[in-house]
Regions:
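Phosphate-end processing signature that detects enzymes handling 5′-triphosphorylated RNA
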Residues: 2-268
Length: 268
């Protein structure tokens, strides 16, 4: 049974920093209809961890090379995601144990537009991610909206096998290179809440950057990230959020990640 969103309490995100908003105003906009032309559903993703101060530097260097997604005049957007897993956290455990082939099932709401999607993400042993999704009314209407049809085709589970585990909220900036061959998503003010333990945690000063592209096409931002000494680093919002908010889970695989994050935040 899926619980009501109204019962899943989570602290609201801070407003995006004023200086970040001012920097975003210097980028040419790209509209949502134009963004929909850039479909990277079969893609290679690479994540990077940075701080707000490093993000400010990156946005200065990226001017003239990227456009920023703009929706209803806003150049950053609010997201709310609920991750589903089996009662014994099978998908979390698969990731924790180092399996390259893994899967995530989530319900994501774009808070500024109100659109909600049931999504299945599959990663293969070559690091390529395939995402399939369908529009739904809410987490309460997954059965009526045909969620099992999507899961039967693309997941190892059906809705009856899954329960809500972890939710998060964050604010996302989306940049697109001038050639429209890649997306760069920049997530700020990431907050977690566990649906069972009711524990909250947050990475307010951490920035999660993800480069999304098909294959190994040229990426203008890679040299900029190297210049700022922003290095690739895995970061699963579901797994990190779970490890932070559920003390009963194994977390050995993620201990080094937490040490790295602490060091990064302390040095900036």
């Amino acid at each position: 049974m899926f619980v009501s969103l109204h019962t899943l309490r989570i602290v609201c995100s801070n407003a995006m920093e004023k200086h970040i908003v001012e920097l975003l105003d210097k980028f040419p906009p790209i509209s949502l209809p134009e963004m929909k032309e850039i479909k990277l559903m079969n893609r290679i993703d690479k994540k990077y961890l940075a701080t707000i101060s490093q993000l400010e530097q990156l946005l200065v260097l990226a001017q003239g090379k990227y456009m920023v997604q703009q929706i209803d005049g806003k150049r950053y957007n609010r997201y709310h995601t609920i991750y589903l897993d089996t009662p014994d956290e099978e998908m979390y455990t698969t990731h924790h144990n180092g399996r390259l082939v893994r899967q995530k099932v989530r319900v994501r709401t774009y808070l500024d537009s109100g659109d909600t999607f049931l999504e299945v993400k599959n990663k293969n042993n070559h690091g390529r991610t395939k995402k399939k999704r369908m529009s739904v009314g809410s987490i309460q209407t997954l059965y009526e909206d045909g969620g099992d049809i999507l899961l039967a085709k693309h997941a190892n589970y059906l809705l009856a096998d899954l329960v809500p585990k972890v939710e998060n909220r964050f604010e996302r900036i989306t940049l697109v290179n001038m050639g429209k061959t890649e997306r760069l998503t920049i997530d700020c003010h990431v907050k977690f809440h566990h649906c069972e333990t009711d524990i909250h945690d947050t990475f307010d000063r951490l920035v999660v950057i993800e480069l999304k592209r098909d294959g190994n096409v040229y990426s203008p931002v890679k040299s900029l990230l190297r210049e700022l000494r922003i290095k690739p680093s895995g970061f699963s919002k579901y797994c990190i959020g779970s490890a932070l908010t559920n003390p009963m889970l194994k977390r050995n695989r993620f201990k080094s990640r937490f040490v790295k994050i602490k060091k990064l935040l302390n040095n900036h």
